Amino acid sequence: MSNAEIFAASGEGVNPIVPNIWDTALVLIGFAILLFIVIKFVVPMFEKTFAERTEAIEGGIAKAEEAQAEATAALEEYKQQLAEARAEANKIREDARAEGAQILADLKEKAASESARITEQAQVAIAAERQAAVVSLRSEVGSLATTLAGRIVGESLQDDARSNRVVDRFLADLEANSKSEGAAK
């Protein structure tokens, strides 16, 4: 037999397994008071704290989304500014190339005109020197020719006017012959 059966058979009317009614009632009243206090005071505090935390989290999420949107907008603005800066740099580079080409063309044009001017001046100087050489040679050739002719002929050709005419006519004949030979070739 079990201990409970032995205890029940002993004749006492109190069952140790079944609690006393007054104890049960007192525990139920205490539990109801505790439940009332928890529902009335503790649960609202937890609800308030939970609501504050939820609001803080949702506010943080909203702030994070707002910051993300601002960062995205700033990134787009940065990309746009970067594209504008690149376009401006390309434009400046192209302008510099065009300006360099224009400067180079101007310098080539100036060099060509300066070269033409120098060539023209050189040709004028050469023509002047040639003319001076021709005049100088005519007088020298004339005097040498008259001296030589005077020695050959045996008489003096000291008359300057006559000797100059003879020399000029001789040189003119030489030039005419050289021009006709040059045209014939």
UniProtKB/Swiss-Prot annotation:
Compartments where found: Cell membrane
Subunit and interaction comment: F-type ATPases have 2 components, F(1) - the catalytic core - and F(0) - the membrane proton channel. F(1) has five subunits: alpha(3), beta(3), gamma(1), delta(1), epsilon(1). F(0) has three main subunits: a(1), b(2) and c(10-14). The alpha and beta chains form an alternating ring which encloses part of the gamma chain. F(1) is attached to F(0) by a central stalk formed by the gamma and epsilon chains, while a peripheral stalk is formed by the delta and b chains.
Protein name, UniProt field: ATP synthase subunit b
Keywords recorded for this protein, A-Z: ATP synthesis, Cell membrane, CF(0), Hydrogen ion transport, Ion transport, Membrane, Transmembrane, Transmembrane helix, Transport
Membrane-crossing segments per the record: 26-46
Topology term for the membrane: Single-pass membrane protein
One Pfam family per UniProt: ATP-synt_B
GO MF terms, alphabetically ordered: proton-transporting ATP synthase activity, rotational mechanism; proton-transporting ATPase activity, rotational mechanism
Disulfide pattern: none
SUPFAM superfamilies: F1F0 ATP synthase subunit B, membrane domain (SSF81573)
Keyword flag Repeat: no
CDD domains (alphabetical): ATP-synt_Fo_b (cd06503)
Gene3D superfamilies associated with the record: F1F0 ATP synthase subunit B, membrane domain
Function according to Swiss-Prot or TrEMBL: F(1)F(0) ATP synthase produces ATP from ADP in the presence of a proton or sodium gradient. F-type ATPases consist of two structural domains, F(1) containing the extramembraneous catalytic core and F(0) containing the membrane proton channel, linked together by a central stalk and a peripheral stalk. During catalysis, ATP synthesis in the catalytic domain of F(1) is coupled via a rotary mechanism of the central stalk subunits to proton translocation. Component of the F(0) channel, it forms part of the peripheral stalk, linking F(1) to F(0).
Native organism taxonomy: Bacteria, Bacillati, Actinomycetota, Actinomycetes, Micrococcales
GO cellular component labels: plasma membrane; proton-transporting ATP synthase complex
Family to which this protein belongs: Belongs to the ATPase B chain family.
